[in-house]
Amino acid sequence: MMEGLDDGPDFLSEEDRGLKAINVDLQSDAALQVDISDALSERDKVKFTVHTKSSLPNFKQNEFSVVRQHEEFIWLHDSFVENEDYAGYIIPPAPPRPDFDASREKLQKLGEGEGSMTKEEFTKMKQELEAEYLAIFKKTVAMHEVFLCRVAAHPILRKDLNFHVFLEYNQDLSVRGKNKKEKLEDFFKNMVKSADGVIVSGVKDVDDFFEHERTFLLEYHNRVKDASAKSDRMTRSHKSAADDYNRIGSSLYALGTQDSTDICKFFLKVSELFDKTRKIEARVSADEDLKLSDLLKYYLRESQAAKDLLYRRSRSLVDYENANKALDKARAKNKDVLQAETSQQLCCQKFEKISESAKQELIDFKTRRVAAFRKNLVELAELELKHAKGNLQLLQNCLAVLNGDT
C-alpha cells in the first residue's frame, strides 16, 4: 500500500483494547478479594482459575486458587436463590453460558474458502476473526468474575458456606448440568411463578416505598430491555460498516495494483483510507459493545433479580395476610387457634425480615447502577470523540495527499 496517511498514535493506538470486567461499581474491601486469574478454553468448556486473597478467619489460607467450570458458577447462584435466608436480598445474576459457536463457525468457513481469496485477504480476515474470538472469550471471563465480585462484596452472601466451598475446595465439586427432566421442571416452576406473579401484583402494597419500587422496576426493566436490543443493532451496524469498508478497500487495492498509472495510484491511496477507516469503525463497534451493550445486558439481568426480590416480598405479604385471615377464622370457630397464631407469627417475622433487608438492597441497587451508567457513558462519550477526531484526521490527511500537498 502507498504510504502517506498517518493514522496518528493518539487516535488509533492499541492501548486499553483488552476487555475489562463489566463495571458495576463494586464496593469490595481487602478482607476478601476474588478474581479470575486465568482461563482455558477446551472445546465446549471453559476452565476458570478463581484466585482468592482473604484475611477472614473462615479460610485456612490467606491466598489460594481453584479451577471451576461454568456449571459450578450456576450451582452457586442457584444455591443462593433456593436459600430462604436470602429471600430479602438481590441475588447477583448468574453469568451467561460461554458461547463460541458463532466465532468457531466463521473460522471454519474461512478455512474452507481459503482458496478463493488472496493470501493477504485470508491473513487479514483470519486475524480479525481470531481477535473477535478472543474478545468474546475475555468478555465471558469478565462476566463470571463480576458475579464472584458481587458476591464477595455483599456483606451477607460473602459469608455463605457454599461460597466458601466454591472458593477454597480444591477438588471437583461434581456439579453437572441439568438434564431434560430438571429443565422441564424449571420450566413449569417458572410458569407457576409467572401465574402467581400476576396474582401477587394485584395486591396493594402496605408500604409506599415498595409500591413505588415495583412500578419503577417494571418500567425500568422494559426500558433497559428495549435499549439493549437497540444498542445491539447499533453495534452490528458499525461492524457491518467496517466490513463494507474492508471490501471496498480490498477492491480498490486490487484495482490499484493492476498498473502504475495515476488513476491506480489514486486507487491505492483511497484504498489505504478505507482500510484505516475500517479499523476506527471496528473499534467504535467494540467500544459501544463493551461500554454500553454489555452494561445494559448486565443491568437487564440485575433488574430482573431486583424484580424477583420484590416478588418474594409480595409473596410473603400475601402469605401474611392469608395467615391473618386464617387466624380470624380459627378464633371465630375457637379451633386450632394456637396453630394459627404460630403460623401468623412466623409469616409476620418472615415478611418483616424480608422488608427490612429488601429496602436497603434496593437503595444500594440504585446507587450502584447510577454510578455504573454515569462512568460508562462518560467513558463511551470520550471514546466516541476520540474516534471522530481520528476519522477527521484521516480524511484531512487523505485530501492533502490526493491534492499533492504532502
Curated annotation (Swiss-Prot):
UniProt GO MF annotations: dynactin binding; phosphatidylinositol binding
Keywords per UniProt: Acetylation, Cytoplasm, Cytoplasmic vesicle, Endosome, Lipid-binding, Membrane, Nucleus, Phosphoprotein, Protein transport, Transport
Sites of N-acetylmethionine modification: M1, M2
Quaternary organization: Forms heterodimers with BAR domain-containing sorting nexins SNX1 and SNX2. The heterodimers are proposed to self-assemble into helical arrays on the membrane to stabilize and expand local membrane curvature underlying endosomal tubule formation.
Family affiliation: Belongs to the sorting nexin family.
General function of this protein: Involved in several stages of intracellular trafficking. Interacts with membranes phosphatidylinositol 3,4-bisphosphate and/or phosphatidylinositol 4,5-bisphosphate. Acts in part as component of the retromer membrane-deforming SNX-BAR subcomplex. The SNX-BAR retromer mediates retrograde transport of cargo proteins from endosomes to the trans-Golgi network (TGN) and is involved in endosome-to-plasma membrane transport for cargo protein recycling. The SNX-BAR subcomplex functions to deform the donor membrane into a tubular profile called endosome-to-TGN transport carrier (ETC).
Comment block on domains: The PX domain mediates interaction with membranes enriched in phosphatidylinositol 3,4-bisphosphate and/or phosphatidylinositol 4,5-bisphosphate.
Name of the featured protein: Sorting nexin-6
Source species of the chain: Pongo abelii
